[in-house]
A protein has these predicted regions:
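A generic structural signal for short, non-catalytic loop/turn and secondary-structure boundary residues
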Residues: 16-19, 83, 103-105, 168
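Long, contiguous hydrophobic alpha-helical segments, chiefly transmembrane helices and signal peptides
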Residues: 26, 53, 90, 110-112
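Active-site acidic/histidine clusters and adjacent loop/turn architecture
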Residues: 16-82
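A generic secondary-structure signal marking the coil-to-beta-strand transition
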Residues: 22-24, 86, 108
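Active-site-adjacent substructure of cysteine-protease-like catalytic cores
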Residues: 77-105
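Catalytic cores and adjacent binding grooves of peptidoglycan-active enzymes
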Residues: 94-101, 106-178
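N-terminal low-complexity, Pro/Thr/Ser-rich intrinsically disordered segments
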Residues: 1-9, 14-16
Length: 178
């Protein structure tokens, strides 16, 4: 992809060059149980894995509300994307509260149904801000991710790490590929 195609999700100084990123068209089952097509931007090395993972999620009929690139939101605002329950990958941004790049800035992380699967910090704060109802991980709503779920295993069996296994923060939406 080009810098122009990435829009506000990329800027000079980002740790990955646009030429190292690829746009991947993804079929997914929506919350309406119909097939939808979305787009992810990922690192070129991960394209075959990402295609396979999302084909498996599709066959599992795991519901994903929407899949859009970060540039669909003003200034590629991550909070707006998460509040919209948008599944996304590349976004040149840091780790909140840190001076380190997020794996999203390398195209090596995917957040899945982020409103339903919030990131919970040790302080008790969480993102996105409209996810309070989903802090209760005993819920069984379609699209939620839990330890041992087939959807989680599809990622982890492919070598991805799930933020739901972390202790601080616990990032239920987040999968990253080292």
């Amino acid at each position: 992809v080009t810098a122009a195609e990435l829009g506000a999700s990329w800027r000079p100084g980002c740790p990955v060059d646009p030429a190292q990123l690829r746009r991947v068209d993804i079929d997914h089952i929506g919350f309406d149980r119909a097939t939808h097509r979305g787009e992810l931007i990922v690192h070129e090395d991960l394209v075959p894995e990402v295609i396979t993972i999302f084909e498996r999620l599709y066959r599992l009929r795991f519901p994903i509300e929407k899949i859009r690139t970060a540039d669909h939101y003003p200034d590629a605002d991550d909070e707006q994307s998460m509040e919209d329950n948008n599944t996304s990958a590349f976004n040149c941004r840091g780790i909140p509260g840190s001076d380190h790049w997020s794996q999203h800035a390398y195209g090596r992380a995917i957040d899945v149904n982020p409103r339903l699967n919030p990131c919970v910090y040790a302080t008790g704060t969480f993102q996105p801000q409209n996810a309070a109802n989903y802090l209760d991980r005993g819920r069984t709503d379609p699209g939620l991710l839990h330890s041992g779920d087939p959807a989680v295993r599809i990622f982890t069996d492919s070598g991805w790490r799930w933020g739901g296994y972390w202790t601080a923060p616990i990032d239920y939406q987040h999968f990253e590929r080292p």
